[in-house]
Amino acid sequence: MSLAKPVMRGLLGKRLRFHLPIAFALSLVAAAGFKYMVTEPRKQAYAEFYKNYDAVKEFNTMREAGIFESVRPSGE
Amino acid sequence: MAHPSQLGFQDAASPVMEELLHFHDHALMIVFLISTLVLYIIVAMVSTKLTNKYILDSQEIEIIWTVLPAVILILIALPSLRILYLMDEINDPHLTIKAMGHQWYWSYEYTDYEDLGFDSYMIPTQDLAPGQFRLLEADHRMVVPVESPIRILISAEDVLHSWAVPALGIKMDAVPGRLNQTAFITSRPGVFYGQCSEICGANHSFMPIVVEAVPLEHFESWSSLMLEDA
């Protein structure tokens, strides 16, 4: 009985052809993951915050809380 | 202001700082992309006994790992330059304030209409009222009208200082004999803190900056009151 000759050449190349596409794909997944889990939510959060932002109401809330020095709460 | 265990930037209180936040996210995304690729390749390299001692060159891979980094650098440079020029725009400011650095306090001058000037010293820890922030509070705050473009001219009277307010995305060196100009708009009312950002002696860490953004009518009342007290 004769055995098949084992593959003796191109082993590193075969390994690289297997792993490099996975490496590039994983790095693109990591970048896309960061973009859609951090970057886009942050942009949305800022857009949402300012969409219905009432500066006067927020200012009055802060004023009554006493955080400003140039404007004291209305009771004082 | 900063809070304990904070990892990222403070919440943006000016349009420029929002742009800087988004650019940082973009650059960090590219950093994660490259780091993941390199980490995977390192693990793949150390977990094999296979080597090829006879590789001399490979034009294809040389082209790939020249062109790809160049493309990545362009993807970083274009938004970076956009923000750089955005930060340089000074569109018709409503008010000009001069901030002068001293050892170890800031002084502010509002000389557009009247001659208003005052010093801003840190409130010592033992004099803080409950709820005030250690090493960040100042006795006189720089009050500005909210949502108005402000030009600020920064200089120093003795040694180098730097006027920085992270929430507004501003940092500008205060150089003796030189006037540095920058501008900002506060997107919302509030109180924004900063600290001197250039080593200037023993009390470099104890000359904070406090910017208070209030509606215009309150700013006008405040400036009238300050002029009367002066």
From Swiss-Prot, chain B:
Q: Which GO molecular-function terms appear in the entry?
A: copper ion binding; cytochrome-c oxidase activity
Q: Which UniProt keywords apply?
A: Copper, Electron transport, Magnesium, Membrane, Metal-binding, Mitochondrion, Mitochondrion inner membrane, Respiratory chain, Translocase, Transmembrane, Transmembrane helix, Transport
Tell me the residue ranges located in the Mitochondrial matrix compartment per UniProt.
Answer: 46-59
Top-level taxonomic group: Eukaryota
Q: Where in the cell is it found?
A: Mitochondrion inner membrane
Binding, Cu cation A2 = 196, 198, 200, 204
Q: Where does Cu cation A1 bind?
A: 161, 196, 200, 207
UniProt remark on cofactor binding: Binds a dinuclear copper A center per subunit.
Which NCBIfam families does the record match to this protein? CoxB
Please explain the role this protein plays, according to its UniProt record.
Component of the cytochrome c oxidase, the last enzyme in the mitochondrial electron transport chain which drives oxidative phosphorylation. The respiratory chain contains 3 multisubunit complexes succinate dehydrogenase (complex II, CII), ubiquinol-cytochrome c oxidoreductase (cytochrome b-c1 complex, complex III, CIII) and cytochrome c oxidase (complex IV, CIV), that cooperate to transfer electrons derived from NADH and succinate to molecular oxygen, creating an electrochemical gradient over the inner membrane that drives transmembrane transport and the ATP synthase.
Q: Name the chain's protein.
A: Cytochrome c oxidase subunit 2
